[in-house]
A protein has these predicted regions:
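Mixed-charge, Lys/Arg-rich low-complexity intrinsically disordered regions
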Residues: 1-11
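Short acidic DE-rich linear segments
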Residues: 76-77
Length: 77
């Protein structure tokens, strides 16, 4: 599964990062490199992006973090 496919399938869903619940949601992606995780608080280390990155963000959060797809697992509700 590519980052874009993962993003399209799981936008806004909560995910585990390396098996831990860190309060992250699927917010976007950066080409084939990273999934952008969004946080409702300021847990993430990124607050703003350039306009190029904003094109791939589907939902707005208070902070963000990059993650490799291989470390993510969607929490099924």
């Amino acid at each position: 599964m590519t980052n874009e496919e993962f993003y399209n399938a799981h936008l806004g869903k909560r995910v585990l990062y390396k098996g831990k619940d860190i309060g992250a949601y699927v917010a976007g992606y950066i080409e084939d490199k990273y999934i952008i995780l969004g946080f409702n608080d300021y847990t993430g280390c990124i607050l703003y992006f350039t306009s190029k990155v904003y094109k791939t963000i589907g939902e707005t959060y208070n902070s963000y973090r990059f993650a490799k797809l291989k470390y993510l697992e969607v929490i099924e509700t």
